[in-house]
């Protein structure tokens, strides 16, 4: 999770690389889901609620921001239901899944994995599918969480 639902950190070295939500990732995987899909569904549920809040007066006015590890889930939500969000702002979010595959070491990327996705698309493809004036990407990161080149 993120915030209060974030997994518990412990002193093991693997947490540094796989992140505090690795257990949640494996639980979702064993249930036949990606952890990213769980996050995407939560974002879409919140977006739908906000769009219908106050008798629908917010419809089409919900702005979505994905900062850090929340970026890929926000990007997928915006790509899946582009009419739900007025705009998407990604900040310090993973630039490309293909970089994770090539990187010998990465940090906290396990929760972003979607089995077989790279056979079909990468994250920049989702950004390109959105209207240019609707999506803003600021300071994209590499698999280690450093500024992407």
Where is each model-derived feature located?
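Glycine-centered flexibility sites
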Residues: 1-5, 66-71, 139
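Primarily recognizes the serine-hydrolase "nucleophile elbow" in alpha/beta-hydrolase
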Residues: 46-120, 126-129
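Conserved strand-to-loop "acid loop" that flanks and positions the catalytic carboxylate
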Residues: 137-143
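Short, proline-enriched alpha-helix->beta-strand connector loops that line the catalytic pocket
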Residues: 130-135
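Extracytoplasmic/secretory ectodomains and luminal regions
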Residues: 37, 124-125
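Alpha-helical structural motif
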Residues: 23, 122-123
